[in-house]
Amino acid sequence: MAHNNNNNINNNNNNNNNNNNNNNKNNNSEYKTNRNLLYKTILNDIENSLQSLIKPQELTNLLEDNINKLKELDGVQPTNTFGNLQNTSTNTTTTTTTTTTTTTTSSPNNNVITPNSNLKQTLSPSVLIEHLNLFGNENFEEGDDEEETSSDSDSSSSSSTSSSSSERVPSKKLKPMAKPRPGGCSICKTQETPYWRKGKDGDKTVYLCNACGLQIYKKKKKEKLSKEKHSIKNVLN
């Protein structure tokens, strides 16, 4: 009788151990998923800060929040990780502004007419999607895009002109002002831009000035970042 009782106790212990192991595996999988999402969000925040899409102080707040979430996952008490940086935020902002001013001074985009921020979008969604498919992974501020020739050569040189216009060249090699396009920019209608951004509206080719192209790129970048942050909150909650 005592032997049977011992066997029952051993079986119960084995079942409990198996249940604990399964729970640990499930918890470990969820833990890794949450950590990976937080790491990805942190990297995206840093990347957007480097591209001047978010301000240094905003980056500090975002990093503080996500690092504390990582600590909570590890069972560590959240702390004010960037507390010592709060007093120096003014100096950091000043340095960043100075750098941006220097970059703008040396950029060929000084003569670009900036579109009105309240201007209604006149492009269909397909144009914006096609535009981002063509240029979404590039840094618009460096001007790494198609160079449009402004020479008025005859038809015999049209083939060489077409070839050179599709080559990607550094911004320092771009001409001061690209050849005007019929109808101008599809958004702000300007005829003056260092170079044109090309997209598709159905079968129709449309052109965007550099300023509008940059504006669309930043807008889509912020929307993407907002969606990723929303998904992180849903997982953690």
Swiss-Prot record:
A zinc finger (GATA-type) spans 185-212. Residues 1-28, 87-118, 152-167 have a biased composition (Low complexity). Keywords: Metal-binding, Zinc, Zinc-finger. Residues 140-151 have a biased composition (Acidic residues). Residues 1-31, 78-119, 140-186 are annotated as: Disordered. GO terms for biological process: regulation of DNA-templated transcription. This is GATA zinc finger domain-containing protein 18. It comes from Dictyostelium discoideum. The lineage of its organism: Eukaryota, Amoebozoa, Evosea, Eumycetozoa, Dictyostelia.
